[in-house]
Curated annotation (Swiss-Prot):
Residues 1-12, 145-157 have a biased composition (Polar residues). InterPro entries: Spata22. The gene is SPATA22. This is Spermatogenesis-associated protein 22. GO terms for cellular component: chromosome. It comes from Macaca fascicularis (Crab-eating macaque). Residues 1-51, 145-169 are annotated as: Disordered. PANTHER family: SPERMATOGENESIS-ASSOCIATED PROTEIN 22. Meiosis-specific protein required for homologous recombination in meiosis I.
Length: 363
């Protein structure tokens, strides 16, 4: 601590002469005494200057005891001193000053029971809207069912009137002071645990409210979309179909459904050699009993595989009634299983084609 003293001023402190702590020849600094006067106007307060050397233990203890008295008085009267030396305050004095600040700002917000401060602060619905459950609105006849804090329950139990509404900025400052006092370590022991739970309750309620809002979203649109999606699968698919038919039935269905593009599947025996034609085409003749069918295959994207005369082949394509030619898109030898199941496929295709032609004639 720096002292501003005159060089010619001589002071007597309890019969002891002032002892300079620094050598004035080497440094031009003001001397410090081991036991200074408290009422000296030249001594600056610790709140102004904080550059001070280590002090003797007996002097610091006397100064601290002298300062604890006005601090305790301010705690009892509810007033805060204007200038209190900060570096010499212990943890107990810091806790008492924080408690006095809280009592002064709250006014009638707390009561003392056996020297225990019980917090009665409740959330004001105008300033801090608590997150209420929407599902209980119908059960409570339109009344919001909000969770009651422990402070509010104690207030209702002891019959204490509700505290006045404070402005929002004062409440936020009060919350910050209480939160900082809780983090301070040893000063945390005197506070109630319920107040700590009340401090973190709004964030938890807000998360619960967001989760409930997501659950309460109406699902009418999603249900409609899923129902339409399922109906589309339940309906019969109108995709491209290959009609299994013999040569005679193929010519018949092509004649009665001229406006419709039909893709036929024919199983017949190769009855001629494969001859090349114009535009990379290959022509051959297929026979089914007494009926014959000239076929053509264009080698545009792939070549025609090797065909053996006298064997059953599977040909897929479109029948041109005017030219009496079957334009193949796929030709390959038929397997044994395909030959056995082909008659059943022909019967199913006949039923479908009769139904389709009847519907087309009615329209």
């Amino acid at each position: 601590m720096k002292r501003s003293l005159n060089e010619n001023s001589a002071r007597s402190t309890a019969g002891c002469l002032p002892v300079p702590l620094f050598n004035q020849k080497k440094r031009n600094r003001q001397p410090l005494t081991s036991n200074p006067l408290k009422d000296d106007p030249g001594i600056s307060t610790p709140s102004d200057n904080y550059d001070f050397p280590p002090l003797p233990t007996d002097w610091a203890w006397e100064a601290m005891n002298a300062e604890l008295a006005p601090v305790m008085k301010t705690v009892d009267t509810g007033q805060i001193p204007h200038s209190v030396p900060r570096p010499l305050r212990s943890q107990d004095s810091i806790f008492n000053s924080i408690q006095s600040n809280t009592e002064r700002s709250q006014g009638g917000w707390s009561y003392s029971d056996n020297n225990k401060n019980t917090s009665l602060k409740t959330w004001n619905k105008n300033d801090f809207k608590p997150q209420c459950k929407r599902t209980n609105l119908v059960a409570n006849d339109g009344k919001n069912s909000c969770p009651m804090s422990s402070g509010a329950q104690q207030q209702k139990q002891f019959g204490i009137p509700e505290p006045p509404n404070l402005p929002r900025n004062k409440e936020t400052e009060l919350l910050r002071q209480t939160h900082s006092s809780k983090i301070s370590g040893s000063t945390m022991r005197g506070l109630d645990k319920n107040s700590a739970l009340q401090t973190f309750k709004p964030n938890f309620q807000q998360n619960q409210y967001k989760k409930q809002m997501l659950d309460d979203i109406p699902e009418d649109n999603t249900l409609k979309e899923t129902s339409l999606f399922q109906l589309q699968f339940k309906e019969k698919a109108n995709s491209l179909r290959i009609i299994s038919a013999v040569i005679e039935s193929m010519k018949y269905w092509r004649e009665h459904a001229q406006k419709t593009v039909l893709l036929f599947e024919v199983l017949a025996v190769l009855d001629s050699a494969v001859t090349p034609g114009p535009y990379y085409s290959k022509t051959f003749l297929m026979r089914d009993g007494k009926n014959t069918l000239p076929c053509v295959f264009f080698e545009i994207d792939r070549e025609l595989p090797r065909l053996i005369r006298g064997r059953v082949h599977r040909c897929v394509g479109n029948y041109d009634q005017k030219k009496n030619i079957f334009k193949c898109v796929s030709v390959r030898p038929a397997s044994v299983s395909e030959q056995k199941s082909f008659q059943a496929f022909v019967k199913i295709a006949d039923v479908e084609m009769r139904y389709y032609i009847n519907v087309m004639n009615e329209t």
